[in-house]
Amino acid sequence: METFLFTSESVNEGHPDKLCDQISDAVLDACLAQDPDSKVACETCSKTNMVMVFGEITTKANVDYEKIVRDTCRTIGFVSDDVGLDADNCKVLVNIEQQSPDIAQGVHGHFTKRPEEIGAGDQGHMFGYATDETPELMPLSHVLATKLGARLTEVRKDGTCPWLRPDGKTQVTVEYYNDKGAMVPVRVHTVLISTQHDETVTNDEIAADLKEHVIKPVVPEKYLDEKTIFHLNPSGRFVIGGPHGDAGLTGRKIIIDTYGGWGAHGGGAFSGKDPTKVDRSGAYIVRQAAKSIVANGLARRCIVQVSYAIGVPDPLSVFVDSYGTGKIPDKEILKIVKENFDFRPGMITINLDLKRGGNDRFLKTAAYGHFGRDDPDFTWEIVKPLKWEKPQS
C-alpha cells in the first residue's frame, strides 16, 4: 500500500495573531448585537504592552472598543507582563473610521437594495472543502492539530497543568492512503507541541504532562504506534510569549481557520468582517455546499469554489471537483449545488443568519477553526438534504 505524509498546524487562543483575530471578532459581535446592519472591517495588531484596533465601521451601535480589547485579552489569560501582555495596563489605540461612501453606494445602494440585490462587498474567490475521513467531514491532520490546541487551553484554564501560559502551537503529520481520490488516514506519524510555560517547570515535566493530559485525550489510540514521533517543546525554552514574544495581526492564520492546507484558499481572512464581506460569507456557504455533497453521499471528498465582483450580487463562477470520488459526474453535482444553494451575499446572510452577533458568536470562530465545529451558532455546518438519484449499476 503506497502512503504519503501530510501535515497541518494550529495555534492556541494565546498566540498573538489569534489574539488579534479574537479582538476583531469581539468588536464585530458587539456591533452586530446592537445593530445587525453594522458594516464592520476591523483589524487588530499587537506588540509588547500595546494593542491597536483600526479599520472601517459604520454602525448605530454604541461600542466601547477599549473595553472589548481589555476584556478579550483578560479572558484569554493575558493578565500580567510575565505572560506576554497585561490586559488592564497595556496601551490600547483605536483608529476607526466610517466605511467609504464609494463602497457603501456600490454594495448597499445606501440601504435601498433588497437582500437579493445586495452586491458583493469586494471581488475575490473562496473555497469550501469536505472529506469523509472524520465525523466532522474535515481533514484528520487539521482536526487533531486544532483539538490539541484547544485541549492545551482547557488544561491551562482548569488548572490541570498550572505551568502553562496562553501562547502555543501544535502540528500533526498524518500518514494517508489515497483510495481512488478519497483520503484514508492510516496512522499519526508525528505530533509537535510548542507551548509557552512558566519558569518553574522542567522540560521532562512538560513532556510528561503534554503526553498524559493533552495528547492522550485527543489523539485516538488507533492512530498511535511505537513509531509515532513526539516533539514536545523542541526548542527547549518558551517562557516569553504572546505579543511580547511576537507581533500579532488579524488575518494571519487563514489556513488554521479553514482546512489545514487541504483543498485550496482564495486568500481572504475572516475575522472582523461583517457578512457583506464575501471573504467570510462566501467561504461559509461553500463549506456548507461541500459538506452537504459529502454528507449526502454524492462524493467522498469535494471542493467547491465561488467567485465575486464588487457590487454584483450573483457569483461570477461556481466550480465543483470531487477528486474522482463522485457517484455522478461533477457537472451534475454542480447543477445540484446551484439548485440548492443561493450564493448571493444578501441571501447567504439570511439563510445562514449571519447578522446575528453577540453571545461571542463570531468570537468563538476566531480560535480553533471556523469549520467542523459542533455548535448551533455555526449555521454553515448544517447539512442540507440534496435529492439525487444513484446511477443504476
From Swiss-Prot:
Query: Which residues take part in binding K(+)?
Result: E43
Record pathway: Amino-acid biosynthesis; S-adenosyl-L-methionine biosynthesis; S-adenosyl-L-methionine from L-methionine: step 1/1
Substrates-to-products reaction catalysed: L-methionine + ATP + H2O = S-adenosyl-L-methionine + phosphate + diphosphate
Enumerate the residues binding ATP: H15, D167, G168, K169, S235, G236, R237, F238, D246, R252, K253, A269, K273, K277
Its job:
Catalyzes the formation of S-adenosylmethionine from methionine and ATP. The reaction comprises two steps that are both catalyzed by the same enzyme: formation of S-adenosylmethionine (AdoMet) and triphosphate, and subsequent hydrolysis of the triphosphate.
Q: Which NCBIfam families match?
A: metK
In Swiss-Prot or TrEMBL terms, this protein is called S-adenosylmethionine synthase 2
Q: What organism does the record attribute this protein to? A: Elaeagnus umbellata
Which taxonomic lineage is given here?
A: Eukaryota, Viridiplantae, Streptophyta, Embryophyta, Tracheophyta
